[in-house]
């Protein structure tokens, strides 16, 4: 039976709780970058070209296909700039498939505020939708296998929870949210601890409920990790045949994760070896933003 202490799905609830705390701060930081260190829309000198009492209606559309993500970040941008004076009419929800030229949402409110918040709101949606779209592509490549796609901690600074939420919207699952929710024992940890067994035993003693993962670079290290009782074993830069042998040797005694050299060309091949997880750092560190635009009507 697979180890009982590891289930990526449980991280979903943890992440959603963290999102509630992180969104206001992330949005405030983004607005301060645009508004001279404040969240005061009056600092937008170009927007002052418009009459102070002018109100406008705007529509945000996508210029390419993808998966939408970022609804709550958009809402928070305009809440911080104008309280409840901006109305948002949503045509999509997080996780929805979107098509080129589709209207995503409409905005009605003070013209100055709509223009001031435009770039910050679109930055969040473009980035998060880009991640969700790439994840969905990878997830579709895994259809018919028993392998689950995971993200990593390789995220853009300040956007950890947001990017991991986008992974969920794309259909993937979360690896560690940070350094406090699971052990990932690598070469330097093993050297400092004395051995794989000593590192795993101490980890299990320190935090009995936390999953213990060990990264290995060859089949001999895999055997050591299995004997030590690791919950998950990460196969780092293994060749495909080595992965098959690792699955055979493990025989359900631990969960296996593949990392390294993963692209949309190799993903399916790796999954068909029978590993449990494939983690891809590029999902959240090489972000290609979705092309969106806002137009006044």
Swiss-Prot record:
Record key words, sorted: Glycosyltransferase, Pyridine nucleotide biosynthesis, Transferase
Residues that bind substrate: 119, 152-154, 176, 186, 215, 236, 259-261, 280-282
GO biological process: 'de novo' NAD biosynthetic process from L-aspartate; NAD biosynthetic process; quinolinate catabolic process
GO cellular component: cytoplasm; cytosol
GO MF annotation: an example: nicotinate-nucleotide diphosphorylase (carboxylating) activity
CDD domains (UniProt xref): QPRTase
Gene3D superfamilies membership: Aldolase class I (3.20.20.70), Quinolinate phosphoribosyl transferase, N-terminal domain (3.90.1170.20)
EC number: 2.4.2.19
Any Pfam family hit: QRPTase_N
Pathway: Cofactor biosynthesis; NAD(+) biosynthesis; nicotinate D-ribonucleotide from quinolinate: step 1/1
Function recorded in the entry: Involved in the catabolism of quinolinic acid (QA).
Protein family: Belongs to the NadC/ModD family.
Assembly and oligomerization: Homodimer Hexamer formed by 3 homodimers. Homodimer.
Name this protein carries in UniProt: Nicotinate-nucleotide pyrophosphorylase [carboxylating]
Organism: Escherichia coli (strain K12)
